[in-house]
Amino acid sequence: MGAGEMAEALGEELEREIQRRWEEMDLLSKVLEKNRDGPLFYFLDGPPYASGSIHLGTAWNKIIKDAVNRYKLMRGYRVRLQPGWDCHGLPIEVKVEQEVLSDEIECKKDIEEKVGVDKFVEKCKEFALKHVEIMTEQFKRLGVLMDWDNPYMTLDNEYIEGAWYTLKRAHERGLLDRDVRIVNWCPRCETALADHEVEYKEVEDPSIFVIFPIEDDSDAEVDLPENSALLIWTTTPWTLPANLAVAVHPEEEYVLARAEVDGEEWHLIVADKLKVVLSVVTDSYEIVDSFPGEALEGLRYRPPLWEEVPKLRELHEEDDRVHRVYTAEWVTMEEGTGCVHSAPGHGEEDFELGREVGLPPHCPVAEDGTFTEDGGKYEGLYVRDANEKIVEDLREKGLLAHEDTVEHRYGHCWRCKTPIIYRATEQWFLKVTEVKDEMLEWIERVEWIPEWAGHSRFKSWVENARDWCISRQRYWGIPLPVWECEECGHLEVIGSLSELEAKAVSLPPGEPDLHRPWVDEVVLKCPECGSYMRRVPDVLDVWVDSGVAAWASLGYPRREDEFERWFLKEGRCDPDDPEAGADFITEGHDQTRGWFYSQLGCGVVTFDTCPYRTVLMHGFTLDEEGRKMSKSLGNVVDPMDVVEKYGADTLRWYVLRSNAPWRDMHFSWQDVRDTHRALNVLWNAYRFTKMYSELDEFDPEEHPLEDLEEHLKPEDRWLLSRINSLVEEVTDAFERYHVHEAARALYRFVTEDLSRWYIRLVRERVWLEGDDPEKLAVYAVLHYTFDRLVRLLAPIVPHVAERIYLDYVRAGDDPESVHLTDWPEVDDRWVDEGLEKAMELVRKAAEAALSVRQRAGVKTRWPLRRLFVEVEDPKRLEDLKDVLARVANVKEVELGEEFPEKVPVAEPRPDKIGPEFRSLAGRVIEHVKDRAEEVARSILKDGEYRTELDGEDVVLTEEHVKVTEDLPEGWEAEEFEGGRVYVFVELDEELKSEAWAREVVRRVQEMRKELDLNLEERIRVWIETDEEIAEAVEEHSEYVRGETRADELHVNEGWPEEVDLEREWEVEDRTIRIAVVVSG
């Protein structure tokens, strides 16, 4: 088969044919039926967002999952193969706004006022379901075996009930809280965001020093001169219209510095440790006083935007606590001035300080990020656009001490990429801080792969976790199941559809749909006062959706049987038992603050448990230079492009073997091509085996391996040992979820052990005539090997493994798919570790011999006379001398602990001898040269050489001399790990004759290939060349005819009138003309 045919055979046509076969035979049902009584393996699929096409990262993720699941299935496990889809939230909403309804939606209010919530929600649902279909087909094309007809989707009512159940449990346990707090806020999406929904990027922002004039020092412990002021630093000028306080550190020293700023004299207060900033705002200054930070508490100042923001004047006049200095331990001496501008409506620490001293969480910024009427002069301006205007006003008022810019990391919305702001708003929270200790305990019980994924990275995230803001002011999501009484404020948290139906005064018409706007219309009757209760309009953070997947995907609480079977292991354990929950999950390392976290939080809140037992964390996909893939860089690789070009199996094997899963993958097209070549090597090995076996009508049942045991050669026994060692190695890797080790071990076996070693060794044996037992032994060994190899390969390259199984391995009543076979067990009777180690030495010796050939300019096809292998234990290689002779293409192999014909010699090191022996150095150097062999042998044997020169004792070691060796003429040496080879590289006339015969054979075989002849087709050959080559061909004519399948061989005997192919070859500057005629 040519290279073009090979690529086609291994590509789309083969894979689609195999996939059609799986579908027609209903492979999924048969696999599940086969394992119906096996042990449970609850695999939980982390749901990708149904918002686009798959990318390289999602492909890698699903391939890892599929490899693990296929392995577990072959081990007899009942694997839960349900795929999942994340269908709600901003990932979908933003796409619908931008791609579906872009003509109608410019901002959030357009959704309600122009489009309508009902239409918007319906479009979001359509969008999600459409992309579920698209991505399902793409995952199927990758060969992923899952129950694609029965996925869990977060938009299903049954799933939503699972989330509602968790919220009800949180309410019952006092872990659901409504509060006004500072939250991350996306002004474009107009909703709160959780900490794990904020992405940080480097941005450039203003960096300004602002003067806050002191108005009154009567309530402080300092007596300040006129024109005293606090100097503050900020990178968010837009927060100054909300300033209500300044914080200082109580225990740090502060200084009062007289300085001139823009022509006006000020007495500026800054922290002593940060007084270097004074040189930034003024050319010269003088320290006139100092005092501890606590002495400044109570100072009252006038905010710098006093005239521009009337609301600040109003608050200043109404509340004596406003615009004063307060002490706070969190004030840092790392940057700024030590005087921190505090806006309780815009910062978490500011907010807590305000709560402590009684300041209101004043926030003059609307949901869309523009200033409200309370923003005074800046009303209607978007906050970041207001920065420039505010800085300009401060400059005109003489209160801008210095302005610059700074590059720093700033939070952005994870979906629309807009810079966030911090706002004080009323939100709903899961009180994670109250169950944090329990969450940390569960982290210790989970098996993390790698270990540091949980015990370092994830643990650190949980230790610093704050209460989880779970409410969103959006539309397409799981509605917050909280109803509030219009009169008395009583709250009801609903945990299921049946509970909602039971408590509803009335239900909207049509089938229940637990989404907005249907659920918004459900009214309850207050059990406390009898008034109406209406639902709080928020929806849930989409991370709550996936966070409840371990039970919601099972239909719990509606379907308790599935929950008991999978989550509770057929009722053998309670929800908080260490064995309960999903057995295995795997996602990218960004999920330490995403899905791993949301599941743990929801699990502890709902069941006092972590809902997963084993976590494999994988990395990100980057380009070859380690850069993140992005459209702007033009380095995005579409996995479907790889599949189209090289096939799904190539992509699968590549991503599984390229690196340890927890490391970031640096995608390389060259490595993809290398992997495809390895698949070709596997295919060629299979084709070779199948072709010759069929030609000889070999039947493994008629010629079982056991019956041919006495005819097995060392290389046969070695391959039988290697395939069983491979079973152990691959099994161990899968058991530890180190799928990369399994993929790499298989890659090495296919490319090195099977193809480049064993088949190379036995190729001549398959050409033996008749039912020669040595040939039959090869076929039996290869059949045994492929029977095990295709099963080991099945989880990684399922299509090619299936094709080889069906076309070559399967026989009689064997299962109709390799994926219905059992995982192979180690066959100990064939395992021979000593033989494997010995063969490894032989391979290294052969590689060393090849290096000698290359250095000497002798081609591998040209035979050599002798090779000596110098090793510590020569006896262990005795049975493999013939193997080494064949591979190294030498007539004779000798073994020993030392090559007897080498002569060790010592070369003096003058730079070492001179300083030590001084005046005697010249005599020592001459002595070494005169007795080079004697000195060398003594040092090699005893580690030193002793003599007496001019009456002085001389002791020499390898420090003083360099020990080398002289070899007889014609010999070359090369070291390898474990020994050294010596090769006699001179060619005598007999060897040259044989070499020329081989060169001719090679050219005729290339011509057979060009004619696309089958193995059994016979030919006639004519050769014209010089006398030396002609004599060589004549001398080895039987060999030439046998190797080329030639009925006739004519050397310098005329030329045929008609030929099928004629070529003139240049070999070693000699001309060989060859004609081939296909026999009739």
Swiss-Prot record:
Motif 'HIGH' region mapped to chain: 48-58
Keywords, in A-Z order: Aminoacyl-tRNA synthetase, ATP-binding, Cytoplasm, Ligase, Metal-binding, Nucleotide-binding, Protein biosynthesis, Zinc
CDD domains xrefs: Anticodon_Ia_Ile_ABEc, IleRS_core
GO BP annotations listed: isoleucyl-tRNA aminoacylation
GO molecular function: aminoacyl-tRNA deacylase activity; ATP binding; isoleucine-tRNA ligase activity; tRNA binding; zinc ion binding
Quaternary assembly: Monomer.
Name assigned to this protein: Isoleucine--tRNA ligase
Organism: Methanopyrus kandleri (strain AV19 / DSM 6324 / JCM 9639 / NBRC 100938)
Lineage of the species this protein comes from: Archaea, Methanobacteriati, Methanobacteriota, Methanomada group, Methanopyri
